[in-house]
From Swiss-Prot:
GO terms (BP aspect): chaperone cofactor-dependent protein refolding
Keyword vocabulary terms for this entry: Chaperone, Cytoplasm
GO MF term list: ATP binding; metal ion binding; protein folding chaperone; protein-folding chaperone binding; unfolded protein binding
Localization in the cell: Cytoplasm
Lineage: Bacteria, Bacillati, Cyanobacteriota, Cyanophyceae, Oscillatoriophycideae
Cited InterPro entries: Chaperonin_GroES (IPR020818), Chaperonin_GroES_sf (IPR037124), Chaprnonin_Cpn10_CS (IPR018369), GroES-like_sf (IPR011032)
Oligomer status and interactors: Heptamer of 7 subunits arranged in a ring. Interacts with the chaperonin GroEL.
Assigned protein family: Belongs to the GroES chaperonin family.
Name under which the protein is recorded: Co-chaperonin GroES
PANTHER family recorded: 10 KDA HEAT SHOCK PROTEIN (PTHR10772), CO-CHAPERONIN GROES (PTHR10772:SF58)
Record function comment: Together with the chaperonin GroEL, plays an essential role in assisting protein folding. The GroEL-GroES system forms a nano-cage that allows encapsulation of the non-native substrate proteins and provides a physical environment optimized to promote and accelerate protein folding. GroES binds to the apical surface of the GroEL ring, thereby capping the opening of the GroEL channel.
Pfam families for this protein: Cpn10 (PF00166)
GO CC annotations on file: cytoplasm
Length: 103
């Protein structure tokens, strides 16, 4: 079996899935206290790096995904599958787990 090299550019989401680069969480509180990793909340904001072709309808057509590459999104706290690539954190989400686009 040949080895497969996986990086951000080789990930192509299927269906209505969205591949998101997780924004880093806060390192310290407003009062200046540094937070240990165990005390940090799981991030819920990230930047879309790839989108699938959309959900397939009963008639065979597709409903396109409402967000695009480069959009910042807010997603459900425990949604998706966490993935680490090249030292960076990503999450693979279903479109239904995206709550809003953030400007």
């Amino acid at each position: 079996m040949a080895a497969v090299s996986i990086n951000v550019t080789t990930v192509k989401p299927l269906g209505d899935r969205v591949f998101v680069k997780v924004s880093p969480s806060e390192e310290k509180t407003a009062g200046g206290i540094f937070l240990p990793d165990a005390a940090k909340e799981k991030p819920q904001i990230g930047e879309v790096v790839a989108v699938g072709p959309g959900k397939r309808n009963d008639d065979g057509s597709r409903t396109p995904v409402e967000v695009g590459v480069g959009d910042k999104v807010l997603y459900s706290k425990y949604a998706g599958t966490d993935i680490k690539l090249g030292g960076e954190e990503f999450v693979l989400l279903s479109e239904k787990d995206i709550l809003a686009a953030v400007s």
